[in-house]
C-alpha cells in the first residue's frame, strides 16, 4: 500500500507534474522579465501555474493588457515571443535557427524601440546563430536592420523583386 501511495503522489498534481511546471514557470518568468527590461518596459508580466498572465504596471498594480499603450502592448507581446522561442529551443530534439518576423517594426515603436528590438535580434544572431528574416512595409525601419535587404514591390496584384538601382 505504501508503494501505491508513493506512485499516486508522484503522478498527482502535487508530484512530478507540479515540480516540472514550477521549474518551467521559474524559467518562463525570468526570461520574460529579461526581455521586458531589454525592451525598456515598465511593466512586468508573470505567468501562474495555470499559465494565466498577470501584468503589473510601473506602480506594481495589476493592470489589464488593454490599459497599456500600443507600444507597451507590443513590448509585452515581443517579450513573450522571444521567451517562448527561447524555451522552445530548450525542448525536444528538433533544432532550428530561423525566425521570421512579419511587420515587426511597422506599428507602435519609435526610433528607440526599433533600436532596442534590433539589438535583441542582433544578439540572437550572434549568440544563437539565428537567421532572422524581418518583413516590413516601412522603408525607414530597414535602416535598423543589418545584413541583406530584399526590396519587393506589388503592382497590379503582382509582386516583384526590385533591383537596388530601382529604389
Q: Which residues fall in each region the model found?
A:
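Terminal ABC-like ATPase head and other globular end-domains that cap long coiled-coil arms
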Residues: 2-167
Amino acid at each position: 500500500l505504501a508503494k501505491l501511495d508513493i506512485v499516486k503522489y508522484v503522478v498527482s498534481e502535487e508530484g512530478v507534474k507540479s515540480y516540472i511546471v514550477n521549474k518551467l514557470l521559474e524559467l518562463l518568468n525570468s526570461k520574460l522579465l529579461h526581455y521586458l527590461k531589454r525592451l525598456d518596459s515598465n511593466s512586468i508580466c508573470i505567468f501562474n501555474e495555470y499559465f494565466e498572465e498577470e501584468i503589473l504596471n510601473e506602480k506594481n498594480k495589476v493592470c489589464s493588457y488593454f490599459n497599456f499603450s500600443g507600444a507597451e502592448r507590443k513590448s509585452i507581446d515581443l517579450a513573450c515571443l522571444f521567451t517562448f522561442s527561447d524555451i522552445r529551443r530548450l525542448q525536444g530534439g528538433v533544432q532550428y535557427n530561423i525566425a521570421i518576423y512579419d511587420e515587426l517594426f511597422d506599428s507602435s515603436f519609435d526610433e528607440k524601440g526599433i533600436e532596442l528590438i534590433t539589438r535583441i535580434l542582433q544578439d540572437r544572431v550572434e549568440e544563437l546563430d539565428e537567421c532572422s528574416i524581418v518583413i516590413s512595409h516601412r522603408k525607414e525601419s530597414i535602416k535598423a536592420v543589418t545584413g541583406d535587404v530584399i526590396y519587393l514591390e506589388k503592382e497590379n496584384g503582382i509582386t516583384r523583386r526590385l533591383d537596388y538601382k530601382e529604389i
